[in-house]
Amino acid sequence: MKARRTVAAALSVLALTAVAACGKDGSPNTDTAKSGSAAPQLPTYQVNADAKLDGSPVWTEAKKNGKLRIGAKSDQPFLGFEDVQTGKRNGFDIEIAKMIAADLGFSADQIEFKTINSSARETSLSGGQVDYYVGTYSINDNRKKTIDFAGPYYIAGQSLLVNKDNSEITGPESTKGKSVCTVTGSTSVTNIKTYGANVTEFESYSLCVEKLLTKEVDAVTTDDAILKGYAAKNQGKLKVVGNTFSQEKYGVGLKKGDAVLQQAITDALKKHEQNGDWKKAYDATLGLSGADAPSIPDLTEKAAG
């Protein structure tokens, strides 16, 4: 919990730097961010040309097509963001997706990122629209009824985003009767309802933030790292309040029953955590504030049986 609070607090420093490092649409401009000699650099990933996953139908089909389809978010600064002008993706989750892809034998130009809303993640995996999903995807037992996970690769905590002049909401206990916005299908919905909040749901966090800025809702709730990205993007207008009130373990989602692919993704995560790529990816995205990287969680998700 201490590590998560430290990361969340330190990310507020981005409010001083993110605006200068953002493009016209508010997306993090990694070229600008890395212009200084001491700026952290994104890692590079060597493609495993000898990768072979016998027994994985998902990998076999992807290899046959020469393309890996990865589900991701597109509206989360410093996590999963798509520049609407260039189509380029950046953020910590995007780097996690790329390092896994390299170990599976796919180069960056063989990746097709697909924006999948939270409410459609399970169906997109089960239906084969994407090969795996990386996008602040919390591991829970209900989701594991229909899909599998590898990981976790990161641990976050739920918090609240409010307007800068809001002094009434200081934490989840003060949301009773208040209008709180979050994303359809996210674990945040269930968590905040226990405090008596009136929940409004949209398909993306950016829509929730728009409603917050126009004061059509009183707060936005989701994981602290996501909220700090939006606070930085909207410098001087929004703030994150209170301590985290949940533990969210981010995992890589994949089609249920593909144990070979699940193990391969687990092995890739372990490798890149141990060789320093995970830390480099964090430092060049969420860690741009200078905050120390949080502890890397144990990889607990394994194939059944």
Question: Can you say where each PLM-predicted feature lies in the sequence?
Answer:
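Bacterial lipoprotein signal-peptidase II cleavage site
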Residues: 18-33
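Extended ligand-binding regions for polar small-molecule ligands
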Residues: 23, 35-53, 252-290
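Extracytoplasmic small-molecule ligand-binding "clamshell" domains
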Residues: 31-132
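Short loop->beta-strand "edge-of-pocket" segments that line small-molecule binding or catalytic clefts
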Residues: 68-72, 90, 172-185
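Acidic, polar ligand-binding/catalytic clefts
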Residues: 109-174
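Short helix-initiation/N-cap motifs at beta->coil->alpha
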Residues: 111-123, 167, 184-186, 200-210, ...
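A ligand-binding cleft/hinge motif common to bilobed small-molecule-binding domains
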Residues: 137-145, 194, 218-247
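Periplasmic-binding protein-like
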Residues: 155-162, 228-269, 290-305
